[in-house]
Regions:
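Non-catalytic accessory regions of SAM-dependent methyltransferases
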Residues: 1-49, 54, 64
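Short helix-capping segments at alpha-helix termini
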Residues: 34, 148-150, 171-176, 242-243, ...
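Conserved AdoMet
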Residues: 46-121
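Conserved Class I SAM-dependent methyltransferase catalytic core
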Residues: 100, 227-284
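Conserved SAM/SAH cofactor-binding pocket of Class I
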Residues: 110-207
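Short amphipathic alpha-helical segments
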Residues: 167-168, 208-212, 236, 262-264
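Flexible, glycine-/basic-rich loop-and-beta segments that form/coincide
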Residues: 286-288
Length: 288
């Protein structure tokens, strides 16, 4: 890293073209075992220049300003430490839309889109109220509102910092009808909901984590006791009071945890309906 820092100090003193910077940055990212090295270097420079990636491809001989080089290399240094790219550029795509993110929230994952897929498959026309528990950046609540505009969506999170990010995203996407409420799971609920969405922390703290990027994400949003199932189990119990009869519960968890979640859910009149990747859906049985 000392050799790299010396190289960067030298490079900022000399004019550098787009192509030259991208090649050098991608090489450094490869040495740091970042598989998407070329893509990441392009996204970082696109962010600094406020230009789309295709502009970089067409203007490879353009010379970077000194301040642009300095900013790009500062971001590159952080990426070499495996800080998530989304935190560096301040946004991440989810379900075809761009969302603001910060270190206060998890970086949206592609597998979480499976929850939206199950929601759209399973929701019934009479089901009109949705709550997203542990909303984080608001991706599930906002996407649900955009895909199901006939529904009323509430979003709960214990973190005021996360709620601030979620509200920014709601404003960005014009979904100001979503209600954002600070709450520990469903503690603040005032009504029964037809649908409960919950991407809660489910990582067992004892698991070996190969992904160094998660070290930069909030532990509060990743880890849970009881082999990762503590918060999910608490929510299952809360559905007795706050999930409407015949209501729909959609969770995310590691597939290795699904069988235990399904077994625990039966104690709360929840019947497993369907799983898709990391997502699993339950229906609440009607009382006799």
């Amino acid at each position: 890293m000392l050799q790299y820092n010396a190289l960067m100090r030298h490079s900022t003193s000399l004019p550098t073209s787009v192509d030259t910077w991208l090649a050098a940055a991608a090489a450094q990212l490869r040495t740091a075992d970042i598989a998407s090295s070329r893509l990441d270097s392009e996204l970082l420079l696109s962010y600094v220049l406020q230009r789309p990636r295709h502009w970089l491809h067409a203007h490879g001989d353009s010379t970077l300003l000194h301040e642009q080089q300095v900013q790009a290399e500062q971001l590159l240094t952080r990426r070499l430490q495996h800080e998530p790219l989304a935190y560096l550029v301040g946004h991440k795509e989810f379900y075809g839309r761009d969302f603001v993110v910060s270190p206060a929230v998890l970086v949206p994952r592609p597998e979480t889109e499976q929850m939206i897929s199950l929601l759209l498959q399973l929701i019934q026309p009479t089901q009109r109220t949705i709550v997203d528990v542990g909303t984080g950046s608001g991706i599930l609540a906002i996407t649900a509102q955009l895909e199901l505009p006939q529904c009323q969506v509430d979003a709960y999170d214990i973190s005021p910092e996360a709620l601030a990010i979620a509200q920014r995203n709601a404003q960005q996407h014009g979904t100001t009808s979503v209600n954002f409420i600070q709450s520990d799971l469903l503690a603040a609920a005032q009504q029964r909901y037809d649908v409960v969405l919950a991407n809660l922390p489910y990582v067992n703290p004892t698991w070996q984590r190969d992904d160094r990027e998660t070290a930069h994400e909030p532990a509060l949003a990743l880890f849970a006791k009881d082999d990762g199932l503590a918060l999910i189990s608490t929510l299952l119990a809360q559905t007795e009071q706050w999930l409407a009869p015949s209501g729909l519960l959609i969770l995310e968890a590691d597939p290795c945890q699904h069988s235990r979640i399904i077994a625990r859910a039966t104690a709360y009149q929840l019947t497993h309906m369907q799983s898709e990747g990391y997502a699993l859906a339950f229906a609440k049985q009607c009382s006799a």
